Amino acid sequence: MRFIPPQRGFNYMSNERLVAAANQFKRLLLDNKLLVVAVVCTTVYLGILDNVLESETMKLDEAAYWLIVENLRQPWLTPIMESFSNLATPVTIVVLWVLVTAFAPGRRVGLCMGVNLILALALNQAMKAIVQRPRPEGFRLAEASGFSFPSGHSMVAMAFFGLLVWFVWRYEKDRVRRALIIVALCVIIAMIGISRIYLGVHFASDVIGGFCLSLVWLVFFTRIIAPLLTADKDIESTPNSTQ
């Protein structure tokens, strides 16, 4: 029997199909970015939760303690970290919510922010009651009560400032201003989480778990609830909201 090599046209079509499939998969990911974020965050959160429930000491927590508590703490830095931490306290969040309600375009943005915050807090308290992880001991620079996982400050920061990011992305027309505001809000979110580790009231896994759970909640909220609450003609949509 004589060997017949495959035709070039077959290879060409196979490669063409692979490229087409790759492009289709890429478009699918781009069209469902929030879903991808939710899946990744859910995976990370469940992985951390499994370790917490098993009462295992995570290398993540040990590394964060070494880096932030043992090597980063300085007398001049502590007041700065306390200030960032205070941005997610009830009084500060209420003041910020009032300001957003007063100055945001449309009449329903404040309602949306309030509903989001209340539900995120309820989710946080429910998870804390289920997991009941004790807070770290022996190196606190601030008073804190209640359970540790997931971090309430981290969840509030991501829920409140993260929803602000969503609003800015949808309704701010100036691209430079939009980018600057979003970067500033993301820095605030990150610094609030870091400050909780620095002050010794949370493990790093508490903070990352709080961020992940809150991001999953935000994906659900912005896809299902927020569009219903913000269906206000007074809010003018930008091209970003139609893409």
Predicted regions and their residues:
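The feature marks cytosolic C-terminal regulatory regions of anion transporters and related permeases
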Residues: 105-142
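Alpha-helical transmembrane segments at the extracellular/periplasmic loop-to-helix junctions
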Residues: 91-95
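Aromatic-anchored segments of alpha-helical transmembrane domains
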Residues: 44-47, 119-126, 187-196
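Short helix-capping/hinge motifs at transmembrane helix termini and TM-loop junctions
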Residues: 53-55, 104, 131-132, 173, ...
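N-terminal transmembrane-helix/juxtamembrane module of multi-pass inner/ER membrane proteins
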Residues: 2-90, 129-131, 135-141
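Interfacial segments of alpha-helical transmembrane regions
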Residues: 32, 36-40, 97-120
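Membrane-helix interface segments
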Residues: 76, 106-110, 136, 174-180
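Membrane-embedded catalytic cores of phosphoryl/pyrophosphoryl-handling enzymes
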Residues: 5, 15-18, 97, 140-243
